[in-house]
Amino acid sequence: MNTYEYKHFTRNLNILSRDKLTLRKMVTSKWLVRLTRHCSSWSIAQRQTQRTQTWVSQQTYAEYQQSLPIILDKGLTDFSFSPELCDRLRKFTAYNVGSGKQIRGLLTMAACEALMQPEQKKELREKMFVLAWGAEMLHAFFLVTDDMEDGAKTRHGQTCWHLLPDVGKYAVTDTGMFRSFVSEILRIYFGKEAIYPKLVDIFNETYFKTHIGQFIDSTFCSNRQYLSFTQEKYALVSALKTSFYTFQFPVLLGLALNNKYSDKAYKLVESIGSDVGLLLQMKNDYLDLYGDEIVEGKTGTDIQEGKCSLPAVIAVRLANGYQKKIFLENYGRWEDKCVDQIRNLYNDLQIQKICIKEETQLYNSICQRINNLSKDSIPPGHLFTKLVNEIYNLKNINYDVKP
């Protein structure tokens, strides 16, 4: 999709929001296939992922991209009585799903393939795509709700869903409806299979734990007790808000699809997954502060929102009395001068260098734990190694600062 095609697509969205009849005519499977096949052009980050991802083969990646409209069509079969409902879900999906780096979808496929027997790959391929898109759809649900709560303006290089002219307050209904739609897709594809209850449990646990993480994160922001930020609190938020649904969730889906889910496997995924999620959260926090907004496709607002982020935790740990006073007076405020004060404080404390150092130390620690796994562990050590390395190298951070 080139620049002209993207502008044409955006213009069509505005037209379609006003003209439901036009929408029913234009949103066809063929159109959606073309859209999803080229969704990498929606953001620089997604283009980088398509070019450089090594989670799965390029053929698998292409088939995965093309499977979304088929999954949507099947999922909407029982809702043909309401074209408006179908149109709204298609539009929400087209705008919010698949335009990022697709970490969770790719991770789900990588986990599924690593656990499959060779003779199962053809049989389970479609189901693997369904679970991968289910993970991405769940991610989209959380991003849209998070953007509403945070007052974010852009996501993946485009205006946030809740700020679109024809959305506004209806974004709450849209997200609730979309979450239920994900459950409907699971029922349609897996409802008659033995693994269905386990898949439902995994999705429900992911929703619940992530919401708890978001609640705790919001509580930390709202009470403004910034000097109480500690590494322990930071790790707790990360484990619930990021670790489970980013890393553990996709791997558990792979285990369930391949009938290898067990309490022992769950505990191993939880143990290593907590640290991997923490690694990803540290990377996200770094990029919120030091990343390129154009490349990342979103505005960084952790300082303004008063988030319990890695830079904030380090600052509280290292600051002297005077610096803590500056931190308390300016952190969690939206005025430009306050944000600048915090950035200057971070520079004085060399936060950028310390973030890089701590991220590297955690990565090395995770690798050592994986190397110590037994050869017959489930999931296997090579799966953890592949996923950790992909996550660690996911963002092309310009490390001009020496660790």
Describe every region a protein language model picked out.
Residues M1-T52:
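N-terminal mitochondrial targeting presequence
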Residues K192-E193, Y322, I370-P380:
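Surface-exposed helix-capping loop/turn segments at secondary-structure junctions
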Residues Y64, L68, I272, L279, ...:
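Amphipathic alpha-helices that form helix-helix packing interfaces
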Residues S377-P403:
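Short, amphipathic C-terminal "tail helix"
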Residues K324-L373:
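Mobile late-domain/C-terminal helix-loop "cap" segments
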Residues L35-D73, R90-A94, Q120:
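N-terminal organelle-targeting presequences
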Residues S80-K324:
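Mg2+-dependent prenyl diphosphate-binding active-site environment of isoprenoid biosynthetic enzymes
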Residues T60-L68, F178, Y207, T242, ...:
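Hydrophobic/aromatic residues within well-ordered alpha-helical segments
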